[in-house]
Regions:
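Hydrophobic alpha-helical transmembrane segments of multi-pass integral membrane proteins
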Residues: 65-76, 104-115, 177-181
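N-terminal, membrane-interfacial amphipathic/helix-forming hydrophobic leader that caps
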Residues: 1-84, 251-311
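Juxtamembrane helix-loop-helix connectors linking adjacent transmembrane helices
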Residues: 46-56, 60, 85-152, 162, ...
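Membrane-helix interface motif
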Residues: 30-45, 116-123, 242-246
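Transmembrane helix-loop-helix hairpins at the membrane interface
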Residues: 139-306, 310
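Residue-level signature of transmembrane alpha-helical entry/exit and packing/kink sites
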Residues: 12-20, 54, 58-62, 66, ...
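Juxtamembrane/disordered regions of integral membrane proteins
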Residues: 2-6, 87, 119-127, 186, ...
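Hydrophobic alpha-helical membrane-insertion segments
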Residues: 19-32, 65, 106, 110, ...
Length: 311
């Protein structure tokens, strides 16, 4: 059974899918509605209000919401859909933590190396603001709460929605596209949208969603996506901050670069060059084959003897 077929191990009534999606994804839905119907001045006022909060308190408030939501998603899967969390995580007999670690180290290594090269070549738009006590608290908050934040996003978009939409439409490409677009829309209230532009940031968010979705389908599990997402977000919190980003933190550096000029380096380069290279690295390491079938193949219900619904 492939990753999407894991949904057959549980109850799949449509009302269960709708109820779980609405209840768990409510925070993302409200974010999008707020962005859609708010005046630009209201958005700016909301961002300015949050900037006045202590940075670590702001981070705790933003990330703390994901803790109960991830737990609630697990409860709905376990007791409403009556299937295991393992089936939501991977098609393997057990979670492969080495895969999580590898993708985590891959994105961290790339980010730190490229940042170091850029800093060595031109540091004029970066302010070194390291404060040991503030950074120690930031590090503690980040390593505790970011796993819940990225966990909810991965288990919801690449996990729950990918599996259940795939079972509904009987293919793989449609849930890959839909969950990637929804992943982008879920971030539409981020302040980066106002600083850089809606469509520019959608290229990045949807492109990142596609990367994580391709990882999940090709590898039959969330492990690589979980590691990548965690490494990316941790470094976004700890390494560099800026006045216009969603994460206002006591990071090691602060960027003063004009965000409107970041189309090439921050959006097109990662999506069109870096992401494909990372997929090739993972494909080589894990022996991915049959790309067409894994990304565009049909979904069929397995024989009953291949699985059982948890009572």
């Amino acid at each position: 059974m492939n990753y999407i077929q894991q949904a057959y191990k549980g109850q799949r009534e449509l009302w269960m899918f709708i109820l779980t999606t609405v209840l768990v994804a409510g925070i993302f839905i409200l974010n999008f509605v707020f962005y859609l119907f708010s005046e630009p001045g209201d958005l700016d006022a909301a961002y300015d209000m949050m900037k006045n909060w202590p940075k670590n308190f702001n981070l705790i408030v933003n990330l703390g919401l994901f803790v109960p939501l991830l737990g609630f998603l697990f409860v709905m899967v376990k007791f409403i859909h009556q299937r295991s969390i393992l089936s939501l995580t991977t098609a393997r007999p057990k979670v492969d933590y080495k895969r999580i670690l590898f993708s985590f180290l891959m994105v961290c290594t790339f980010t730190i190396v490229t940042f170091s090269i850029g800093y060595y070549m031109d540091s004029s738009e970066l302010i070194f603001q390291f404060n040991a006590s503030k950074f120690a608290l930031l590090f503690l908050i980040s390593i505790i709460l970011f796993p819940f934040q990225i966990g909810l996003e991965e288990y919801l978009f690449r996990g729950y929605l990918m599996q259940h939409i795939g079972v509904l439409v009987k293919n793989k490409w449609f849930p890959l596209i839909v969950t990637s677009v929804l992943f982008g829309i879920a971030h539409s209230a981020n302040p980066e949208i106002g600083a850089i532009g809606f469509w520019k940031m959608m290229i990045f968010y949807v492109g990142t969603g596609l990367l994580l979705g391709i990882m999940t389908l090709m590898d039959d599990g969330l492990e690589l996506a979980l590691g990548f997402h965690l490494g990316n977000n941790l470094l976004a919190s700890l390494l560099v901050t800026a006045d216009w980003t969603a994460l206002q933190t006591d990071a090691i550096f602060k960027s003063t670069a004009d965000p409107s000029l970041s189309m090439l380096s921050e959006i097109l380069l990662p999506v069109l060059i870096v992401y494909p290279i990372m997929l090739l690295i993972l494909a080589k390491r894990y022996g991915w084959k049959n790309w067409m079938d894994r990304l565009f193949g049909k979904i069929t219900e397995p024989q009953k003897e291949d699985y059982k619904i948890i009572e």
